Amino acid sequence: MRARLSLLALLLIVGTAHAAYERARTNEREHMVEEQLISRDITDEATLAAMRTVPRHRFVPEDVRRSAYDDNPLPIGHGQTISQPYIVAYMTQAARLKRDSRVLEIGTGSGYQAAVLAELCDEVYSIEIVEPLAHQAAATLKETGYERVHLRIGDGYNGWPEAAPFDAILVTAGAEDVPPKLFEQLKEGGRLVIPVGPAHSTQFLKLVTKRNGKPHLHTLMPVRFVPFTREKP
C-alpha cells in the first residue's frame, strides 16, 4: 500500500513539474509573439495564432532548447539550422495562406515551419534532402500532432509534381536562382517565397507571383540562409 502511494505521489510530482514546464514555454511563446513579431509588423492573425500554438522547443535539439524562443536561428545538426521565429512568421505571412491552400515547403529541417503551415492549412507537403533530419522531423511532427504533413526525402529543386499545383511554395534554403520546376508547380496566382543569392553570403528574400503564367518578382528583405543542397549526380 505504501509503495503504491509513493508511486502515486511521484507521478503527481512529475506531472505537476511537466505542467509547470509547459506553462513556462507557453509564456515564452507569448513573449516571442509580442516582442519579436507584433513589434516588427507581423500582423496576420492566423500567422500569429500559429506561432503562439506550435511548441518550437519540441523542434530543436535538447542542448539548445533553453534558447528555442530567442530571436536567433539555432543549429539542428548536419550543418542545418532552424530559422529565427521572425523569419518563419514573415515567410508564412508573405505566402497569404488560407485553410484550403495547398502548400509546399522545400527544406523540412526540424519540421517547425511545416508545423506552423499545418496550423494554417490542411494540405502541407515538405521535402528534406538530409535523410536523418527527415526521419527526426517526421517523428517530431507525429509526437506534436502534425502527422498529416506529407513528408518526402529528396531533392527539393524538382518540387513535388504529383501533388502540384500549389497555392504557395516556401523555400527555407538559399538558392542561387529560382528553380524553374518550382515555379512551374505554382497555381496561377500562386506565391513562391525564396531566399536567392550566393551561398554563405547575404541573400535576398524574394516573392515570386505567377501571373498569366509569368513570374513577377518582388524583393522583400536581406537574409542569410544555409545553402540549397542538391543531390549529387
UniProtKB/Swiss-Prot annotation:
General function of this protein: Catalyzes the methyl esterification of L-isoaspartyl residues in peptides and proteins that result from spontaneous decomposition of normal L-aspartyl and L-asparaginyl residues. It plays a role in the repair and/or degradation of damaged proteins.
Top-level taxon of origin: Bacteria
Keyword Transferase belongs to the record: yes
Residues the record marks as active site: 83
Example GO biological process: methylation
Cellular location(s): Cytoplasm
Pfam families the record matches: PCMT
InterPro entries: PCMT (IPR000682), SAM-dependent_MTases_sf (IPR029063)
Family: Belongs to the methyltransferase superfamily. L-isoaspartyl/D-aspartyl protein methyltransferase family.
Any one cellular-component term (Gene Ontology): cytoplasm
Protein name: Protein-L-isoaspartate O-methyltransferase
Catalytic reaction equation(s): [protein]-L-isoaspartate + S-adenosyl-L-methionine = [protein]-L-isoaspartate alpha-methyl ester + S-adenosyl-L-homocysteine
Broad class of enzyme this protein falls into: transferase
Any one GO MF annotation of this record: protein-L-isoaspartate (D-aspartate) O-methyltransferase activity
Gene3D superfamilies attached to this UniProt entry: Vaccinia Virus protein VP39 (3.40.50.150)
PANTHER family in UniProt: PROTEIN-L-ISOASPARTATE O-METHYLTRANSFERASE (PTHR11579), PROTEIN-L-ISOASPARTATE(D-ASPARTATE) O-METHYLTRANSFERASE (PTHR11579:SF0)
Annotated EC: 2.1.1.77
CDD domains: AdoMet_MTases
Annotated keywords: Cytoplasm, Methyltransferase, S-adenosyl-L-methionine, Transferase
Organism whose genome encodes this protein: Opitutus terrae (strain DSM 11246 / JCM 15787 / PB90-1)
